[in-house]
Design a protein with these regions (language model features):
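N-terminal pre-domain/capping segments
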Residues: 1-88, 94, 130, 163, ...
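Acidic-and-aromatic substrate-binding clefts and catalytic sites of carbohydrate-active enzymes
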Residues: 11-18, 36-49, 70-80, 108-113, ...
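Histidine-acidic metal/acid-base catalytic patches
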Residues: 1-8, 17-28, 97, 124, ...
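Residue-level detector of anion-binding/catalytic polar loops
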Residues: 33, 60, 99, 135, ...
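Conserved beta-strand positions in the central sheet of alpha/beta enzyme cores
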Residues: 36, 63, 102, 137, ...
């Protein structure tokens, strides 16, 4: 059965001082089926505190999103740092009973400019995540040299068992959403490589960096009716995460907006 998750990154950010303890009261207002826990770089000195908090609150967190600087370190060939941080993220995911671990295999200004670094290190990352009982998912992160679907293909050629998380916003940014439905990329769903989806809208054109924001469904130009028709066609029946930024500059969280997103996804899933 499909589960609709909320990214904790949609709730917790700099405007509310990345106060993870807000998750307890906010979770009571949200009509999602669980959460995708987003790790931040400022939390490495309190990992035990955070995992203990999540265990005590009993939040259902089947997915964890790695801290994004790991991908940047990989891109810069800072291998030791990347692996050290990745192991910390894996341990946290195991502690909060997540089964899926999302990673930005490339990130930052360096992005995919040195993609051979990212390609080479994947094998070790997968081995580490497997040792923690986690399914590692590589996201179709935006690029400033190549494009994510091309890199997915390169990764799959080297590592046939690789798994992915598909982000609708990231795909729309590169005008690659249609590739998901194409004959060229049908191997992604025929062979079950996509294990998770990030559902975000996008209101820009091709690679409009200033418009690269996580928007709620309906606030951009993505055809979600077509997307969910595809989801039905390929019989995908697993997890989705809503990531639309819900906090304002004062740190106040618009839970009503997120609940509308959850309801919209449920409507699409029932309608088809």
């Amino acid at each position: 059965m499909c589960k609709i998750l909320c990214s904790t990154g949609a709730l917790i950010g700099l405007p509310n001082n990345r106060n993870y303890k807000l998750l307890k009261p906010l979770s009571k207002e949200l009509l999602c089926d669980g959460f995708e826990f987003m790790m931040y770089s400022s939390w490495y000195d309190k990992t035990d505190e955070i995992t203990g908090f999540l265990q005590d609150t009993g939040l259902y967190t089947p997915v964890m999103h790695c801290e994004k600087h790991i991908g940047e370190a990989i891109s810069k060939n800072e291998t030791d740092e990347a692996l050290c941080l990745f192991k910390i993220n894996c341990n946290m995911a195991q502690e909060i009973n997540a089964s899926k671990l999302v990673i930005h295999l490339w990130d930052g200004i360096t992005s995919d400019q040195n993609f051979q670094n990212n390609l080479r290190l994947y094998k070790e990352l997968e081995e580490i995540s497997n040792s923690y009982g986690l399914c590692l998912l590589v996201e179709n992160v935006v690029c400033n040299a190549g494009n994510p679907m091309k890199h997915w293909l390169e990764l799959a050629e080297c590592y046939p068992g690789i798994n992915f998380v598909f982000d609708t916003k990231m795909a729309a940014f590169h005008q690659q959403l249609e590739l998901l439905y194409s004959e060229e990329y049908k191997w992604l769903w025929q062979d079950g490589h996509i294990k998770h989806y990030h559902i975000n809208d996008y209101a820009g054109g091709y690679m409009e960096w200033e418009k690269l924001r996580s928007l709620p469904l309906g606030a951009g130009n993505i055809d979600f009716k077509k997307f969910f028709s595809f989801i039905h066609k390929v019989k995908y029946n697993d997890t989705f995460t809503i990531e639309a930024t819900a906090f304002n500059q004062n740190g106040e969280v618009d839970t009503d907006m997120l609940n509308r997103c959850f309801e919209n996804v449920r409507h699409y899933l029932k309608e088809i």
